[in-house]
């Protein structure tokens, strides 16, 4: 497919993916071994990429992707695509058939438009991403394409798509790993250091281990699983259908199952996380566990914009935003959402707003994490990974702190010093 300018936009459904999308655009979320954005760019192969997202994310998004954000710098014809679209073979075929001046909707939601340079500039500048507005730019037709609507769908889709890692890297040739199944299904990017004994089970799917990873003894990994660059896995049990981003540390006694762990996150100690999506720069304290099954074996419900939504899933864990910290012994109930920059203690049986110190099960009222503490904690964690905190990082924290103040107030989060009696 030949595309001159590709514009990926996020729509108002970004709120469905909170707390993950407080700090990321919707199309930056993981789906398989890549983000939705990476999948779109790889499939459509455009000459130029433009992104449209919430204004407060602009600088960080430009830095992470290298693409122009919220500017209509269109060159030639433009394909404008909803960032929640998973571009598989069906979607690619439909997009390939799209004619200039046409727009596609699915269930009344704009999926894509193909416009000439002038109209595309106007559509992007004015954020014409609703069907009723798109009609002034293009003829609209309905198609049967699924947009990702809720965060738990990313977990399910990732488990289905991880088979794609069989085409990554090269076959592992060392003898330190006991491979159960075809050796061709254990893939690496090279420079993997293994301290045996390690078992990798690829009978249900491939396993990919990124560059410069360390896999220490008594680790077991089941496929399909993706492990990003520069990770350290120390005696952990990584069950099937897991995604682990770059520079993560997963330690002795850790058990992961069907879970997305984003980059720079630490889970060094004993504890279980299953059927969950965990953001970047999260530190998970020893003994932290996530429930992914109700005692009744009923389906898990998740609070979306103030209403309970039945996920239809019997097994579902939690959704953890970026920069969350859990103390030792934290226990998180199924279906809960943890806002970015929050600190958790004890049992977490309610959703936690951003910038909140939570210890209700210890008899303490939730307290607002001070802005200065959030900034300094980020700086310290970055420093431990050899990463420099930037002005953009600090400005995002400040802006997000302001944007989420009302949410904390409605949830009864108080200002003041946190202390346990």
What are these regions (language model features)?
Residues 1-185, 191, 355-421:
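Terminal amphipathic alpha-helical/low-complexity segments used for targeting or macromolecular assembly
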Residues 5-9, 36, 237-246, 283:
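Short low-complexity stretches enriched in small and charged residues
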Residues 11-16, 27-28, 235-236, 249-416:
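Glycine-rich hexapeptide-repeat left-handed beta-helix
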Residues 19, 25-28, 197, 224, ...:
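Proline-rich low-complexity regions
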Residues 19-22, 136-140, 213, 264, ...:
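Generic, low-specificity signal for short hydrophobic/alpha-helical stretches with a mild N-terminal bias
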Residues 33-36, 205, 334:
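Residue-level preference for nonpolar/small residues embedded in alpha-helices
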Residues 77, 197, 341:
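Conserved beta-strand and immediately adjacent loop positions that scaffold enzyme active sites
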Residues 169-279, 294-295, 304, 310, ...:
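Extended beta-solenoid/beta-helix repeat architectures
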């Amino acid at each position: 497919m030949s595309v001159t300018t590709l514009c990926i936009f996020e729509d108002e459904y970004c709120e469905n993916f909170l707390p993950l999308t407080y700090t990321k655009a919707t199309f930056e979320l993981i789906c398989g071994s890549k983000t939705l954005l990476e999948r779109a760019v790889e499939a459509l192969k455009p000459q130029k990429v433009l992104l449209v997202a919430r204004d407060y994310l602009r600088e960080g998004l430009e830095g992470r992707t290298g693409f122009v954000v919220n500017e209509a710098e269109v060159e030639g014809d433009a394909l404008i695509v909803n960032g929640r679209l998973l571009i598989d073979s069906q979607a690619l075929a439909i997009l390939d058939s799209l004619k200039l001046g046409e727009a596609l909707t699915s269930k009344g939601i704009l999926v894509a438009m193909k416009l000439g340079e002038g109209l595309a500039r106007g559509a992007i500048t004015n954020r014409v991403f609703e069907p009723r507005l798109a009609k002034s730019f293009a003829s609209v037709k309905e198609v049967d394409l699924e947009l990702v609507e809720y965060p738990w769908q990313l977990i399910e889709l990732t488990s289905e798509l991880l088979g794609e890692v069989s085409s990554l890297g090269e076959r592992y040739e060392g003898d330190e790993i006991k491979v159960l199944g075809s050796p061709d299904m254990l893939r690496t990017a090279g420079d993997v250091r293994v301290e045996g004994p390690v078992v990798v089970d690829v009978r249900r799917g491939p396993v990919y281990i990124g560059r410069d990873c360390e896999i220490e003894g008594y680790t077991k990994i089941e496929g399909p699983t993706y492990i990003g660059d520069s990770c350290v896995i120390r005696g952990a049990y990584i069950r099937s259908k897991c995604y682990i981003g770059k520079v993560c540390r997963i330690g002795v006694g850790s058990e992961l199952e069907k879970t997305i762990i984003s980059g720079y996150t630490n889970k060094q100690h004993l504890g279980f996380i299953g059927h969950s999506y965990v953001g970047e720069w999260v530190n998970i304290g020893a003994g932290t566990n996530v429930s992914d099954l109700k005692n009744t074996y009923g389906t898990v419900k998740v609070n979306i914009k103030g209403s309970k939504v039945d996920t239809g899933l019997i097994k579902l864990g939690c959704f953890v935003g970026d920069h969350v910290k859990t103390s030792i012994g934290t226990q998180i109930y199924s279906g809960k959402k943890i806002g970015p920059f929050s600190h958790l203690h004890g049992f977490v049986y309610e959703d936690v707003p951003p910038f909140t110190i939570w210890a209700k099960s210890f008899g303490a009222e939730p307290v607002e994490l001070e802005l200065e503490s959030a900034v300094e904690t980020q700086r310290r964690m970055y420093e431990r990974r050899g990463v420099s905190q930037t002005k953009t990082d600090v400005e995002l924290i400040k802006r997000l702190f302001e944007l989420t103040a009302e949410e904390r107030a409605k949830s009864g989060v108080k200002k003041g010093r946190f202390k346990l009696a």
